[in-house]
Amino acid sequence: MPQTQELDQRIAELEMKIAFQENTLEELNQALIDQQFVLDKMQLQLRYMASKLKDLQSSNIASQAEETPPPHY
């Protein structure tokens, strides 16, 4: 009988560990989904900013290298 109790206790401990691991895995999965959402949003913003920068560079505004220095130089 004591051996059966030990086995039951070990099974219960293993079941608790599995439940904890499943919960942790779900939390990690959700964190990964959230991070991917943020990454997608940042990539979209980066594309937008790159497009805006390209538009500014191709406009009639001279680059800093082409600008004449201010009179106090």
From Swiss-Prot:
Segments forming a coiled coil: none
Cross-referenced Pfam families: SlyX
Database matches in InterPro entries: SlyX (IPR007236)
Top-level taxon of the source organism: Bacteria
HAMAP family documented for this protein: SlyX
NCBIfam families listed in its UniProt record: PRK02119.1 (NF002556)
Family statement: Belongs to the SlyX family.
Protein name: Protein SlyX homolog
Gene that this sequence comes from: slyX
